[in-house]
Amino acid sequence: MTLMNCDPATGSCRIPDAAPTLPQGAKQAPGGEVTLRYIGDPMCSWCWGISSTLEELARYCEQKGIGFTLTMGGLRAGGGDAWGPEFREFLRREWTHIAKVTGQPFGFSLLSAKHFDHDTEPACRAVVVAEQMLDQKRPVASATLAFFSAVQRKFYVEGEDPKNVDFYRSICEDASLSFEDFRAHFATAAARQAVYRQFAQCGEWGVRAFPTLLLDLAGDLKQLSSGATTAASLIERIEHLLDARID
């Protein structure tokens, strides 16, 4: 399976079937009684497409006292399709379509590069490292989502390479994080292990496509959406599930 399994109708991209999984029985992650769980990848084009939707949802959750978490999915951890004319043309069509549907900006300078390794693991790892460093901030979820969105923008609009650690210098500065501390942690085995644990959690949840949103009701996971969606429809679905829980 390749990155070309992006569905313009549903607004989602699927991960390879060989994704890692956790042992049976590890069905839920720690969190509050009610938590909205966003599963995505900074280098998933449809995840960038719904960036404004996620920002609105994060604000809604904060106002309602609902937990909000990000879990990295590893769309193409380890690398993707060969960087040839066919794949670059696929990306051009896909990004053009997503821009038209969602209004999100895309730059196309990256598609002029002769060589590029579409490995999404480093970008996912960067978000995990940032979240660990942001742990002293409140609210952590909003700060992590802002970092995630900044990585997306720098990749999709500015066309820079998230595998290069210097890619994150300005993003760390904007987030008031020490870039030198980030750089040191980013290169560690512990950081790689942490991001692969998140990939494995996605597999255990049965998440195979991004973006996906789950509502965790004290360990009872309800899928809200898989693919492009709107904040209004998601909020309606959340409130319906919460009302049903009260009844």
Residue spans for each PLM region:
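C-terminal cap of thioredoxin/glutaredoxin-like
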Residues: 2-16, 20, 39, 43, ...
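A short beta-strand-turn-helix
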Residues: 14-34
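Short low-complexity stretches enriched in small and charged residues
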Residues: 24-29, 78-85, 167-172
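Local sequence-structure signature of Cys/Sec-based thiol-disulfide redox active-site neighborhoods
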Residues: 28-56, 67, 71-74
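A generic fold-level signal
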Residues: 31, 121, 207-208
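Active-site-adjacent beta-strand anchor residues
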Residues: 47, 116, 224
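Structural alpha/beta surface segment adjacent to cysteine/selenocysteine redox centers
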Residues: 51-155
